[in-house]
Amino acid sequence: MGERITLQRLLEMQKKIWNFKISVDPETAELVAREQLKSFGQLSRIGILVTLPLGIYALVMLFAFAGPDYIAVSSFFLVIAGFMGGRNYFRQVALDPDTADYKAVTRSIVLESIITGIAFSSILSIPFAFGQIPFSLDIAILAMGGLALGGFVYGSIPRAQTYYLLITTTIHALSFIAAEGYAGISAAVLLVFFALCIDYIFRMFFFNFVQRHIHASRQKDAAETVRLLLHDYAEQSSDWLWEINDRHLIVNPSARFASALKME
């Protein structure tokens, strides 16, 4: 019975994370969106540094196995991926998340995730699909590393993360099948499973990220409400003040208190 309840709660939590939508007032939604941009700006700069060794490793494999034509095509996609990464870096440096048009910036990030996903995954997938690079553990590591890196960079923008993972996984899976035939199906299925795990993990991080900010916003609103109530109570209480003399008789009553006792 306990195991069934635990499994049921786990499935409910998973469904809640996959179908999560921010149902709060516009002010809180904007606060969360701006915090997303701040988080993305920090993570994307780290992601660019991590991308460098992956790109260098991919170039080494290209020059070791692929022909000149495929090296040229892959270098073209590498330049596109590098351009998008540099564009994103300099935009985030100049961006002020507190004043920027967060909707326009988010749309730009989503578009960048699509272009980056196509470019970054095509660097090795195209020469590998046409037999220029032999299938090895290095190919699988680079493919999985690209998925994990994309989930890390775009994790604070779920739509961008989904597009990147979907495009990258599809291109790599098709290249596995094209290069290895039926033998590549198992590798493609494993890659899809890995991508789903990455997507779920970073969605869970985003879910907790949003819940923390919503809770903090509600706590702030509750504290402000209590402050206003206490202020109102103090103002109302001051209307009923009075003083007493040495004989314990009321003197200097407030206007409201005197009016109530008809002492004026």
Question: What residue ranges belong to the model's regions?
Answer:
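Hydrophobic transmembrane alpha-helices and their membrane-interface boundaries in multi-pass
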Residues: G55-I56, V60-L149, I167-T169
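Short, charged cytosolic
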Residues: G2-T28
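Sensory modules in modular signal-transduction proteins
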Residues: E224-D246
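Central hydrophobic cores of alpha-helical transmembrane segments
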Residues: Q161-H172, L191
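Membrane-helix interface "capping/anchor" motifs
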Residues: G150-Y163
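Hydrophobic alpha-helical transmembrane segments of multi-pass membrane proteins
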Residues: I22-E27, S39-D96, A173, V192, ...
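Juxtamembrane or sensor-core-proximal signal-transducing alpha helices
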Residues: L190-V226
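PAS/PAS-like sensory domain cap-loop motif
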Residues: R247, F257-E264
